[in-house]
Amino acid sequence: MYLQPKKVRWRKQRRGTLKGKAFRGNKLAFGEYGIQALDRAWITQQQIEAVRVALVRSLKKGAKVWIRIFPDKPYTKKPNEVRMGGGKGDPEGFVAVVKPGRILFEFTGVPEEVAQEAFTIAASKLPIPVRLVKYGEFTFKY
């Protein structure tokens, strides 16, 4: 099941800019390990779900996973082979706006080798470079 808002105030939003670094959500809050973004991007609801499934499958039982981002920005798309103009396209889905330094996922309850393997699998599902951070480690190397 994909994450998305229950209600949106506006069906269509402007794209906005992706400037600066993440000053909120850049520290570990729940788990022992975290996946931190090193670049800026829109992460779609499908990508978030793919990473969640990959983490849950690779971490096995006894582990807990937290999703620290939420896709709350609607994005639009025009149909294929449609001429330019004619207004903005229809809403296609939702994205989470991610800036460098943002913690995307957290997990706990596994040894470091298992965490590293799970991170490698999860990182391949994301469109941006990410790094694994541990609790107590300096997290501002982005």
Swiss-Prot record:
It comes from the Bacteria. GO terms for biological process: translation. Gene3D superfamilies: Ribosomal protein L10e/L16. PROSITE patterns: RIBOSOMAL_L16_1, RIBOSOMAL_L16_2. SUPFAM superfamilies: Ribosomal protein L16p/L10e. One of its GO terms (cellular component) is cytosolic large ribosomal subunit. CDD domains: Ribosomal_L16_L10e. Transmembrane segments: none annotated. Pfam families: Ribosomal_L16. Keywords: Ribonucleoprotein, Ribosomal protein, RNA-binding, rRNA-binding, tRNA-binding. GO terms for molecular function: rRNA binding; structural constituent of ribosome; tRNA binding. InterPro entries: Ribosomal_uL16 (IPR047873), Ribosomal_uL16_bact-type (IPR000114), Ribosomal_uL16_CS (IPR020798), Ribosomal_uL16_dom (IPR016180), Ribosomal_uL16_sf (IPR036920). Belongs to the universal ribosomal protein uL16 family. Binds 23S rRNA and is also seen to make contacts with the A and possibly P site tRNAs. Part of the 50S ribosomal subunit. This is Large ribosomal subunit protein uL16. It comes from Aquifex aeolicus (strain VF5).
